[in-house]
């Protein structure tokens, strides 16, 4: 049995006040995942870390955030959503402080893993709380702000990291400290402004076994994705062992979820057409969001020779596209009540943007690159958050948490896998390009002065040019692959059922049968 402690509907002003706190904490949570991308060389150097530890500083946060996302979502369906958001903020703040105080790479990795638990909670719960505050019909315009913040955080994180490490009086530790005061402010803002109904359910049972199996299965697969093609080959016993173990654990999780009263991921929701197709589309959008930020930054720094700060500034067209599309499309959805046309259009624009980026090399006009990045941004901004909205519109309020976190989970998973796979393709392509260019220049193999070294200043000028050209030319190839994968998102969006957004927080209750009495 369940009881709901009702609250008066929040006014537009009250929603904006609460939304300010939610967006603040979501911003710092997502920035924490991307800010280290340009700062890591200095961080690992200062802590005397290894290449393996370099990878794990990023992987640890991504791993715990992705694995914990569906668990946070299910908890939101069972317990006080406001309290869970506040707990996530506290976990994030503690993890950030510990990371900033780390004295060696091992301590930093452990702190980042703990921080990731808070990040996973905030990524899932912010969307759940918004769904509990605002009916789907009105949610579009507010989701526009949410999508814009997520995009700015993802693309702007590397820029902020570059500025911090390039500023002598700050230092790399502020990459972790910078979000702490903002998160604390958001905590107090939410305590004062967030007022949503509290669902109280009797005899609640958490599916700990299912949650553990999901976390373990996803963790094994993400660890494999992080190390494949670097520590071992794609076709190796390590690959078969890790992929096999991950799939077995996830298969067991499905078996458990199908038989428990309170599954972490309700399978009846996942089997719904809208949810299933949104999951597929979210995988492609996730790769666009994360892959674009990672590899475009590398393209500008290595392929074109710009500094970390300059590379961050050059990604502004993509940031502007995401932010503008998120806000404009959100308002159009609220006005029309239809969501499918905008998701389809967004995924098509995403394909066009990637197709344009597939033609770039180390000499391509920055105006052309900027225009292509803007298209990618518009595609992401038109589809990313609206896929969550489409799912939220088709499930009852009691399942909003699980449904929203499922989409967020697959978006993060798609981004993780996409970055790893595209990174492996890029590395192989760069190696081939460098080898052929050195041979064409008459430089014997093994005498290129360490051409694979990313510290280009340590290379002879002629070899520097070869390495830059190799990276610049290879980057277009991986975006061609991205365009092909984004086509899957177009197909998934096109197959979604057109559904008008409902104007109530919850689905209409089925009509109760009138008892018939006999005399």
Residue locations for each model-derived region?
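Hydrophobic transmembrane-helix bundles of small-molecule transporters
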Residues: 166-281, 288, 348, 468-473, ...
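Transmembrane core module of solute transporters
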Residues: 13-70, 107, 209, 234-402, ...
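Interfacial helix-cap and linker-helix signal at transmembrane-aqueous boundaries
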Residues: 43-44, 75-76, 160-169, 225, ...
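Helix-loop-helix hairpins in multi-pass membrane proteins, especially solute transporters
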Residues: 69-209, 397
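Structural signature of transmembrane alpha-helices in multi-pass secondary transporters
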Residues: 29, 58-61, 65, 92, ...
């Amino acid at each position: 049995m369940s009881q709901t402690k009702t609250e008066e509907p929040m006014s537009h002003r009250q929603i904006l006040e609460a939304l300010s706190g939610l967006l603040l904490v979501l911003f710092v949570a997502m920035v924490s995942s991307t800010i280290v991308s340009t700062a890591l060389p200095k961080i690992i150097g200062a802590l005397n870390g290894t290449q393996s530890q370099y990878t794990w500083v990023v992987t640890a946060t991504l791993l715990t955030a992705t694995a914990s996302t569906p668990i946070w979502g299910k908890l939101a369906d069972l317990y006080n959503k406001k309290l869970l958001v506040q707990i996530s903020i506290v976990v994030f703040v503690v993890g950030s402080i510990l990371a900033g105080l780390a004295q060696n790479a091992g301590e930093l990795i452990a702190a980042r893993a703990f921080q990731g638990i808070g990040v996973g909670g905030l990524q899932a719960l912010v969307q759940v709380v918004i769904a509990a505050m605002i009916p789907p019909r009105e949610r579009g315009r507010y989701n526009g702000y949410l999508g814009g913040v997520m995009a700015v955080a993802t693309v702007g994180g590397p820029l902020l990291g570059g500025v911090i490490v390039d500023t002598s009086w700050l230092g790399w530790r502020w990459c972790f400290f910078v979000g702490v005061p903002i998160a604390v402010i958001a905590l107090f803002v939410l305590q004062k402004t967030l007022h949503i109904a509290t669902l109280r359910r009797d005899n609640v049972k958490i599916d700990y076994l299912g949650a553990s199996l999901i976390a373990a299965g996803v963790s094994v697969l993400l660890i494999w994705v992080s190390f494949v093609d670097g520590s071992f080959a794609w076709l190796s016993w390590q690959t078969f062992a890790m992929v096999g173990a991950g799939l077995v654990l996830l298969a067991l999780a499905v078996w458990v979820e199908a038989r428990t009263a309170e599954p972490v991921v309700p399978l009846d929701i996942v089997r719904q057409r809208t949810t299933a197709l949104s999951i597929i589309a979210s995988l492609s959008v996730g790769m666009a969001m994360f892959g674009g930020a990672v590899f475009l930054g590398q393209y500008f720094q290595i392929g074109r020779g710009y500094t970390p700060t300059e590379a961050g500034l050059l990604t502004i067209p993509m940031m502007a596209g995401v932010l503008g599309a998120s806000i404009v499309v959100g308002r159009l959805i609220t006005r029309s009540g239809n969501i499918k046309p905008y998701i389809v259009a967004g995924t098509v624009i995403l394909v066009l943007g990637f197709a344009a980026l597939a033609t770039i090399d180390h000499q391509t006009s920055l105006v052309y690159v900027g225009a292509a990045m803007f298209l990618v941004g518009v595609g992401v901004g038109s589809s990313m958050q609206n896929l969550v909205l489409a799912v939220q519109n088709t499930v009852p309020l009691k399942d909003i948490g699980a449904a929203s976190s499922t989409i967020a989970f697959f978006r993060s998973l798609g981004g993780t896998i996409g970055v790893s796979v595209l990174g492996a393709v890029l590395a192989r392509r760069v190696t081939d390009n460098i080898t052929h260019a050195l041979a064409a220049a008459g430089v014997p193999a093994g005498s290129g002065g360490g051409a694979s070294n990313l510290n280009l200043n340590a290379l002879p000028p002629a070899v520097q040019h070869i390495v830059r050209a190799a990276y610049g030319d290879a980057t277009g190839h991986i975006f061609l692959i991205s365009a092909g994968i984004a086509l899957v998102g177009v197909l998934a969006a096109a197959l979604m059922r057109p559904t008008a957004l409902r104007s109530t927080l919850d689905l209409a209750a089925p009509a109760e049968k009138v008892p018939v009495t006999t005399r």
